[in-house]
Amino acid sequence: MKNYRKRIADDILMRKLEGKGAVLIEGPKWCGKTTTAEQIAASILYMDDPEKKEQNITMSELNPKRLLKGAAPRLIDEWQLAPKLWDAIRFEVDHRGETGQFVLTGSAVPADTREITHSGTGRFTWLTMRPMSLYESGDSTGEVCLADLFSGTSEIEGDSNLSIDRLAFLVCRGGWPQVVDMRDEIALDQAMDYYDAVVHSDINRADNVQKNPERVKRLMRSYARNQGGQVPNTVLAQDVAASEEMPISEETVAAYVSALRKIFVVEDMPAWNPNLRSKTAIRSSDTRYYIDPSIAAAALGIGPDDLINDLKTFGFLFETLCIRDLRVFADALNGEVYHYRDKDGQECDAVIHLRNGKYGLIEIKLGGDKLIEEGVKSLKSMEAKIDTDKMNAPSFLMVLTGTGDYAYRRQDGVYVVPIGSLKN
């Protein structure tokens, strides 16, 4: 890439390097981990350099310390190819007694973790990178700051320049750094290429087990149809069998989903468990999401025009895009993103909960007055359920929209914010 676009993870990486001897950057292939780490590295070891790959792996077995020589911070790219390096780095960090020594990047969890005997607690810290948010790719004006909403700002203003057609394109293009400056039609090809690579090779890297590409495709299609749903593996198996006429066992679904998780293609969302005024059963299962909406679009074989003609599917994939962006922003604020749903049917699409105890409630709606009103009503009923004697009241309620030219605060205090105006 000619020009490095600043990432939200840049500042997080610097902060983490100040506090620990080694930082492990994880995330999907193509999301920019190596490029981000290269910006601060004083020396670099590319484990998968074709000319040196076998030599590097052999050296990691015989004399791993040799590979760690170099100015700090030393970047070790695709470290998972040589899991023995983990213990060697832990040992080296212990003996140097300094922070900021190593940055490791990896697009998969090591297929064989038997070589790792220590957890790395106290020496390593983790950083998850995802594809770019709209703010990072230059598609959001960034005039509304999420941090300001947590600090209690009352008025907001911000414009969004995204038309419905442009938004459909951005869902299908995804946040892959390489595609941001490409012509639109070429950019759309890249998500399909990414999907093909997952189906035919990347998913096998996760556990060194060859998988049936046709089954992988069908499972990924089912996963795409269930974005934002709390769907167990049994239901995914039934969905594949019913719609694809290809029987698949629950065990196979579990193995394939686990492999997709290990290569960071899926990132499911945990349930939020607040203190409530009255007892109700909270649904504790995770919510299904791809790490980027473009993977879901590719798995369904659809493009921007298809989304415009099928607003229901567009709504689901728009939610995946918003969750991606909120996760990127939450990381910068020391927060996590959760989902809430209970047996009474009360739901909240996203809850950003910060480490300091503050939290915000968010409903995601593609747009239009009717849907925005639905979102506001849901947020207000969710707020009323929370027992504020036992926990803080929410810092804000927000309807996050796709369409709409500007952000504003309603008279009832709810923020309405287009995703094309938001930043961390």
Language model regions located:
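Accessory nucleic acid-recognition modules appended to NTPase machines
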Residues: 184-358
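Conserved catalytic/switch belt of AAA+ P-loop NTPases
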Residues: 86-110, 118
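Hydrophobic anchor at the beta1->P-loop junction of P-loop NTPases
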Residues: 25
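N-terminal pre-Walker A segment at the start of P-loop NTPase domains
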Residues: 1-14
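Conserved lysine of the Walker
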Residues: 33-34
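Interdomain motor-coupling "hinge/lid" segment immediately C-terminal to the ATP-binding subdomain
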Residues: 114-229
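Domain-level recognition of nuclease-like catalytic cores that cleave nucleotide substrates
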Residues: 402-424
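Short glycine-rich substrate-engagement loop in P-loop NTPases that contacts/grips substrate
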Residues: 45-73
